């Protein structure tokens, strides 16, 4: 690393960005069981098991309410075709509540397979690193004391922007994991609504929303791949320009590219919901 304070400030900001981008790449390929050593997942599974008892009780309630609303009289319930239909609905709903965790993890693993396919097809094993061009390093190091004063302000502002964008981006990815945990913990309650025909739309909406959260990972990976391609062709640097103009131009274009990535990551949930019509 250079001994120049201005260069160090920019390189530290880019290091923070690269570290967070690498962390995102690692988090996206992790399952909830592996996240943070699996400690959170173990607690969520225990909560899921406790809520499952409530879900089974609600299952009976939704089933009875559904029977009362869909059948005009008790005589209809006694008809073999109606009785069979109700029995199948109840059995399927109970299976969904009992094995809800396994079903949700199966759906998550399907999306993880999609993410791996996208990565392999793009030929990316990890996120590309953003590096400060040597032309800027040389120009800044050649500046005198008074010439470097404006550069301090430019690099402070640019470094602050890059650091803030790094943390906004990583917070969005952590937010996805927290939503996965929330959906998993409370799943038996909305899944129990499948027992009644009038209430089944709640269960359908829950499954769609959970699938949307899982698919956010694929959108985030695509956004990171596109940014990595941008990073492979860094902003053009005019070696004949003044150092302040050179640094300002570089930081401006770099921050714009980063804003595009952060915006895509932040809007991943909205993009998926628009795709799925939610």
What are these regions (language model features)?
Residues 44-52, 84-88, 92, 141, ...:
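Alpha-helical membrane-interface segments at transmembrane helix boundaries
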């Amino acid at each position: 690393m250079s001994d120049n304070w201005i260069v160090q400030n920019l390189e530290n900001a880019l290091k923070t960005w690269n570290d967070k981008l690498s962390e995102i790449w690692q988090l996206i390929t992790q399952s909830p069981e592996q996240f943070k050593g699996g400690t959170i997942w173990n607690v969520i599974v225990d909560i899921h098991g406790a809520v499952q008892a409530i879900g089974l009780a609600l299952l009976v309630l939704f089933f009875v309410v559904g029977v009362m609303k869909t059948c005009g009289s008790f005589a209809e319930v006694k008809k073999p075709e109606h009785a069979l239909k109700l029995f199948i609905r109840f059995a399927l709903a109970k299976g969904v509540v009992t094995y809800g965790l396994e079903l949700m993890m199966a759906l998550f693993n399907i999306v993880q397979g999609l993410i791996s396919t996208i990565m392999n097809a793009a030929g990316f094993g990890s996120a590309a690193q953003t590096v400060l061009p040597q032309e800027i390093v040389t120009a800044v190091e050649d500046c005198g004391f008074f010439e470097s004063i404006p550069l301090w302000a430019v690099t402070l502002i640019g470094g602050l922007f890059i650091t803030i964008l790094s943390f906004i981006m990583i917070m969005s990815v952590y937010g996805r994991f927290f939503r996965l945990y929330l959906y998993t913990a409370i799943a038996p309650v909305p899944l129990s609504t499948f027992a009644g025909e009038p209430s089944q739309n709640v269960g359908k909406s829950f499954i769609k929303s959970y699938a949307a959260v899982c698919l956010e990972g694929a959108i985030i990976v695509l956004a990171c791949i596109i940014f990595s391609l941008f990073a492979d062709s860094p902003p053009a640097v005019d070696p004949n320009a003044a150092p302040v103009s050179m640094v300002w131009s570089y930081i401006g274009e770099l921050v714009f590219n980063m804003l595009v990535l952060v915006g895509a990551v932040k809007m991943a949930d909205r993009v998926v919901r628009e795709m799925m019509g939610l």
